[in-house]
From Swiss-Prot:
Record motif 'HIGH' region, residues: 41-51
One Pfam family this sequence matches: tRNA-synt_1_2
Keywords attached to this entry: Aminoacyl-tRNA synthetase, ATP-binding, Cytoplasm, Ligase, Nucleotide-binding, Protein biosynthesis
EC number: 6.1.1.4
PANTHER family from the UniProt entry: LEUCINE--TRNA LIGASE, MITOCHONDRIAL (PTHR43740:SF2), LEUCYL-TRNA SYNTHETASE (PTHR43740)
GO biological processes: leucyl-tRNA aminoacylation
Localization per record: Cytoplasm
Any one annotated GO CC term: cytosol
Family membership noted in the UniProt record: Belongs to the class-I aminoacyl-tRNA synthetase family.
Enzyme superclass (EC): ligase
PROSITE patterns given in the database record: AA_TRNA_LIGASE_I (PS00178)
Protein name: Leucine--tRNA ligase
């Protein structure tokens, strides 16, 4: 073909890969393995440009590693459960299963049209029984170990949708979808004991050398380990007490009040006889409990009749119900020191609560104005009785000893992270394999009865899950006693499925959760996904991996060796979204320019970690470059088809210069490949093509060598055109299984070099000189040059500064 027909070229290449199972991975202990994985998508129905960029990054890495001779695993699957499928099913009057499977089929064809090197023989969809059977089995093992449990928990309850909402789904006190006023409701929920692994999850962050520092910091903060004291405040005229955790026991003598959560048992008890307090608690139930919102929303409180006794001074301390205290954190109570905590200060200002300063600056110079703000730094204790004059460290130890000796406190290590709530009151999810028996209590399903299948013959409505209304699902015999019992109707949070899919790819058809292949492939060598998953998904996957390790299923401690967090795709400076009307349909681009152009632009426009700004001219530019590559191959077809090798003894001056530039760019490309700086690798390809086009009278052998190197560097980015041209020229059948080029150090040895000549720091001329010249010979050549003689004339040379093979500066006066 004389013209670049991308449609024909891409169809031919994809057909070849299909017929030859080019991407199928097979365990081979004689080869170094490389497991490359992009985060699996939710099957929404169509690909967007974010998908294209994410999977192109992964494909470039996978193809490059394969050309390095490694045994590459590059799988793909579908995160197929979740509420969006229910919503779509209701809207389109289809079952979630039908809707999901239809979307998967279409999106798979879109991925194939982009030439991604996925091993589809390992495809998993989390809604398939063959997948979720094993997470049900695993849950039962965790339940038997006491790592999975059920307890009552306060949740955001949507009375219209009849389901629990995450904090993020509550907007201005209303359900994000139904618009109903949200209620705080206590219902039974299932949890995994991630807190049992909090220390290890925190410690092992230090092992993650291949992760971005930003992600590691986010996980460290989310786990939130803090060491402090738990202090006991006795309730006056009662045998009850309130326990509070503090990391600042040095401020204990400055406590002005205690704050308790609206759901605290003491608050609920008093509300029985106090209608105003009950109204306040009801109001608190309608506000967001997200930490970000708690930090900014108005601080509100209600003074109770309860009084506590200070554990050291013996003074009485008022107890307030406060909207910023969460029952789910610590004991649901805090000690408030308005003089030394800004949040407590704001609350005290609003309700005219007295401040007591107990810390002064260490330098004795800083002036404090507690009428304006709290003094929150550590310093020296004052107004603290026997503890006066102590610094933070000494005060911590002294107060700890006092509390311990008098049974009024103890040292505690607290974590910000709390056990993972894994149950959802929705239909489209993996059934939790537990049974409720009146006689036996909670009983796991027998393993031989797994999977507990999700019924597909359901009628979905907008209100809650239909599982409780399906008798054949709900009613079962107790596995223990055989008496009538009922199934659990909650389903797993979809994070449960996405926390172990990477491991199932290693043995997708195994008749057990994981087989020995898992330890060949794991850990994942390169994991690619958005930084928005830094905490939830990536932390849960790390937790799950440790659970699987302790079950004897894997031997490694961590799931992902290296993590690449790609930036967003922007248009007009904003993230692409349908609501903004700034989306670009990848399919339209593929139809207009071809998959290789779309792939090339997405890699060239910005480094992977940075956001990519969409540019129509950038896409045109990528397409023009590929046409130049094709035209060079077509124009030089007969030359490139020759089976010739380089004879370095017969190279012309231009040949040597061209080879130097080609190999210098190859060397840079290899360095940038290993750093995942793909935009500069593409730039190196463009420079190599320019070199081949710009030098006159290049020998056929140099043209062939240079173009062969170009195609191999470019192949991971634009596999279709490179596959086609590799075959057309006769270089081989399959470029994917060709060795990536290596640097010829001899080619990088210059016969000549370009010397910049300066006089008094100003550039005057540039001279080409023999690379073998010594410093003295270089000076001699420069000073004998006619142009230089003209510039110097009769001036006196003070000194000569020489930077070898780069620059010479002649200082004259």
């Amino acid at each position: 073909m004389s013209e670049y027909n991308f449609t024909q070229i891409e169809q031919q290449a994809q057909e070849y890969w299909r017929e030859n199972n080019s991407f199928k991975a097979v365990e081979d202990k004689n080869k170094e393995k490389f497991y490359c994985l992009s985060m699996l998508p939710y099957p929404s129905g169509t690909l967007h440009m974010g998908h294209v960029r994410n999977y192109t990054i992964g494909d470039v890495i996978a193809r490059y590693q394969k050309m390095q001779g490694k045994n590459v695993l590059h799988p793909m699957g579908w995160d197929a459960f979740g509420l969006p499928a229910e919503n779509a099913a209701i809207k389109h009057k289809k079952s979630p299963y039908e809707w999901t499977k239809s979307n998967i089929a279409y999106m798979r064809s879109q991925l194939d049209s982009l030439g991604f090197s996925f091993d589809w023989s390992r495809e998993v969809a989390t809604c398939d029984e063959s997948y979720y059977k094993w997470e049900q089995w695993f849950f039962i093992q965790l339940y038997k170990k006491g790592l999975a449990y059920r307890k009552n928990s306060v949740v955001n309850w949507d009375p219209v949708d009849q389901t629990v909402l995450a904090n993020e789904q509550v907007v201005d006190g209303r359900g994000w979808r139904s618009g109903a006023l949200i209620e705080k409701k206590e219902i039974p929920q299932w949890f995994l004991k991630i807190t049992d692994y909090a220390d290890e999850l925190l410690k092992d962050i230090n092992q993650l050398d291949g992760w971005p520092e930003a992600v590691k910091t986010m996980q460290t903060n989310w786990i939130g380990k803090s060491k402090g004291l738990t202090v006991k405040f006795k309730i006056q005229n009662s045998d009850k007490e309130i326990e509070v955790f503090t990391t600042r026991p040095d401020t204990l003598m400055g406590v002005s009040y205690l704050g308790i959560a609206p759901e605290h048992p003491l608050a609920l008890e008093e509300a029985k006889t106090n209608s105003q307090l009950k109204s306040f608690i009801d109001e608190c139930k309608r506000i967001s409990t997200m930490e970000a919102d708690l930090a900014t929303q108005e601080k509100k409180g209600f003074k109770t009749s309860i009084q506590a006794i200070h554990p050291i001074s013996g003074e009485t301390v008022n107890v307030w119900v406060a909207n910023f205290v969460l029952m789910g954190y610590g004991s649901g109570a805090v000690m408030s020191v308005p003089a030394h905590d800004q949040r407590d200060w704001e609350f005290a200002q609003k309700y005219n609560i007295a401040l007591k300063q107990v810390i002064k600056p260490s330098d004795n110079k800083s002036k404090l104005d507690l009428d304006k703000e709290a003094f929150t730094e550590k310093g020296i204790l004052i107004n603290s009785g026997e503890f006066d004059g102590l610094n933070f460290k000494s005060a911590y130890q002294a107060i700890k000893k006092y509390l311990f000796d008098n049974d009024k406190g103890y040292e505690t290590t607290n974590f910000r992270i709390h056990d993972w709530g894994i149950s959802r009151q929705r239909y489209w999810g993996c059934p939790i394999p537990m049974i409720h028996c009146n006689d036996c209590g909670l009983v796991p399903e027998k393993e031989e009865n797994l999977p507990v299948k999700l019924p597909t013959n359901v009628t979905l409505t907008e209100a809650g899950s239909p599982l409780k209304d399906i008798p054949e699902f709900l009613n079962v015999a107790c596995p223990n006693c055989g008496k009538p019992a009922t199934r659990e109707t909650d389903t797993f949070d979809t994070f449960f499925e996405s926390s172990w899919y990477y491991a199932r790819y290693t043995c997708p058809t195994a008749d057990k959760m994981l087989s020995e292949e898992a330890n060949y492939w794991l850990p994942v060598d390169k994991y690619i996904g958005g930084i928005e998953h830094a905490i939830m998904h990536l932390l849960y996957a790390r937790f799950f991996h440790k659970l699987m390790r302790d079950q004897g299923l894997v031997t490694s401690d961590e799931p992902f060796k290296n993590l690449l967090t790609q930036g967003m795709v922007l248009k007009d400076g904003a993230k692409m979204s349908k609501s903004k009307g700034n989306t670009v349909d990848p399919q339209e681009l593929i139809d207009k320019y071809g998959a290789d152009t779309v792939r090339l632009f997405s890699m060239f426009a910005a480094p992977p970690e940075q956001s990519l700004e969409w540019s129509d001219t950038g896409v045109d530019g990528a397409n023009k470059f590929l046409r130049k590559v094709y035209n060079y191959a077509y124009t030089n077809k007969e030359i490139l088809a020759k089976n010739i090798t380089i004879d370095v003894t017969k190279l012309s001056k231009n040949d040597k210069k061209a080879r130097y530039e080609i190999y210098a760019n190859l060397k840079q490309a290899i360095f940038d490949f290993d750093k995942s700086q793909f935009n500069t690798v593409v730039s190196a390809c463009m420079k190599i093509l320019n070199t081949l086009n710009n030098y006159d009278n290049l020998s056929d052998s140099v043209k062939l060598e240079g173009f062969s190197i170009l195609l191999r560097i470019l192949s991971p980015f634009t596999p279709h055109i490179c596959h086609y041209l590799w075959q057309e020229i006769g270089l081989g059948e399959d470029i994917l299984h060709t060795q990536f080029p290596t640097v010829d150090d001899i080619a990088l040895e210059k016969d000549e070099f370009l010397l910049v000549v300066q006089i008094n720091g100003k550039v005057k001329v540039k001279l080409e000189l023999d690379a073998s010249l010594t410093k003295e010979q270089v000076e001699q050549e420069v000073l004998s040059d006619e142009q230089i003689k003209t510039f110097i004339k009769d001036k006196q040379i003070v000194k000569v500064i020489y930077v070898p093979q780069k620059l010479i500066n002649i200082v004259v006066k």
